[in-house]
Amino acid sequence: MENVQRLDCPVCGGKGTFVITSHQIDIPYFGPVLETTMICEKCNFRRSDVFPLEVREPKKYILKIESERDLNKRVVRSSSAYIQIPELGVEIKPGPLAEGFVSNVEGVLNRVDNILQTLIRWAETEEQKKKAEELRERIKKLKEGKEEATLILIDPLGHSAIIGEGVEEEILSEEEVEKLKEGIVIMDLDKDKEKEKE
């Protein structure tokens, strides 16, 4: 069932132009998630995220992209997840503007390619443009099955996953979780209660 709300836009102040759409979907081998999209019809501000509706452990997922078949593996990325492709030097960190999505490996590569296209337009030097164009070419080869790389998804909140055969999963240690949470805004009501008791 889809839930739609209209509010005033917190970005531009447009009256009733901020549309929040949320719906629950069930992802095989992951469980139910709430997918939320926020769009302002006036200023075009857009944000989306994915929230699992079941408690999950903080994990790291590792997938070797070795063939075109691997491009179809499902990726659930929440705004708290890190995405890495070490062979390409790609690291996408979570933050206030990070977006969650449900896609596949090819969709992740397309998102990286879109970022590179933007970098090419904004590049200040020819060297920066050349590096971005080389990375785009490597992504193209990955999608054609002519190159191999590793996709790593790390989520200290456990809200993300790579789903499919051949995916390695590692539960994160408490130390890893604390280190990764540094860049993420989290409201922990239990900690606030503990402080009140002191």
Swiss-Prot record:
Protein origin, superkingdom: Archaea
Gene3D superfamilies: ZPR1, A/B domain (2.60.120.1040), ZPR1, zinc finger domain (2.20.25.420)
Alphabetized InterPro entries for the sequence: Znf_ZPR1, ZPR1, ZPR1-like_arc, ZPR1_A/B_dom, ZPR1_jr_dom, ZPR1_Znf1/2
GO molecular function: zinc ion binding
Record key words, sorted: Metal-binding, Zinc, Zinc-finger
Zinc-finger ranges (C4-type): 9-43
A Pfam family reported for this protein in Swiss-Prot or TrEMBL: jr-ZPR1
Keyword Thylakoid: no
Keyword Glycoprotein: no
Family note: Belongs to the ZPR1 family.
Protein name per UniProt: Uncharacterized ZPR1-like protein MJ0530
Organism: Methanocaldococcus jannaschii (strain ATCC 43067 / DSM 2661 / JAL-1 / JCM 10045 / NBRC 100440) (Methanococcus jannaschii)
Lineage of source species: Archaea, Methanobacteriati, Methanobacteriota, Methanomada group, Methanococci
